[in-house]
Amino acid sequence: MKTAKQLLQAYIDGSAQDSATLFADNGALELPYLADLGVEPRYEGPRNIGAFLTFLHEKMYPGFKFVDVKIYIDTPDQAFGEYTIHQKSGISGRLVHQRFFGHCVAANGKIFLLREALNVLAAADGMFPNGIGDVINKR
């Protein structure tokens, strides 16, 4: 059975669909700060998680790979790490430097919860054609 660290590393290294299969049927991917941008902050189940990750991998940051991966906490059922992307956005055309912090909770060899924190200003630069300006104009 995979540990939380092994699951987190496989998520970091995997394609959108490969990463989605690591989640339990009732597993969730949370990016709570995306709510500040008006974006859904929680995705449940491998299918919904896969759809969101496909958007990230294919549209928002086509071909991205995580770099500078560091795992700071490693227990059988929890892992915490940071990982970075330097990628041109397929939406805005901007080069985005984004660091993620992820807390992975594992149960029965699957990801039960992966909660990620990120820089919402960098996310807005990649997610919207006019960056944070589009978020401000919506309010």
Model-derived features: positions:
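Short acidic-aromatic low-complexity motifs
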Residues: 1-28
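Flexible, active-site-adjacent loop/turn segments at secondary-structure boundaries
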Residues: 21, 41, 94
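A solvent-exposed, acidic/Ser-Thr-rich amphipathic alpha-helical stretch
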Residues: 25-71
